[in-house]
Amino acid sequence: KTIGLTKKFGSKTAVDNLNITLTNGVYGLLGANGAGKTTLMRLLCNIQNPTSGRILLNEKNIVGLGERYRNLLGYLPQHFGYYPDFSAYDFLRYVSALKGLDEKAAHKKSKELLEAVDLSRESKHKIKTFSGGMKQRLGIAQAMLNDPRILILDEPTAGLDPKERVRFRNLISAFSKDRIVILSTHIVSDVEFIAEEIIMMKSGQIIHFGNPQEITSEIDGQVWEC
């Protein structure tokens, strides 16, 4: 959970006094560009330090947990780094080593995830030959290598075609049991079918936190579909 979580960049407040509690489930993070979604995710991943406030996991500050907290995380930033001359399989093996997986587990998990994101046939191809959607699918796979208890995905469906987005939704639905999954997107349909809760942000603040039915009921009679 977050307590009074605030992040400022100079005079600009990117995240403004957030107080939220998350339990196991899928959370969709919605908001316009500049709403504070990416900054919030980076704070939750302990990549950036808050200006004030705290983030707690089981009542313990994540700053004090250090590596123990990071071992529980899977993260896909909007633009993830990769070595263009690595094959998809070699890249996942490399990231597996960084995450501390042993040889046997790394091989097994890499193969499983390449299958899950439909890249098995391209596993030996160099990443520089991949389309944007293929790279994004590889990014989703690397975030899941360590079987994280907390999975944070920033714009995970960017570059995916409709068929790939359906596969992604099915993958997250299957993976989310007994885990916290947070994904930000501009594509409402990506979270409409899999998110138990929607977090809507504007100007660094949460303007709505609830299930999709609650959101639609609030605007009932104000929106018409043609």
Segments predicted by a language model, with ranges:
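Conserved ABC transporter NBD signature motif
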Residues: 53-64, 68-69
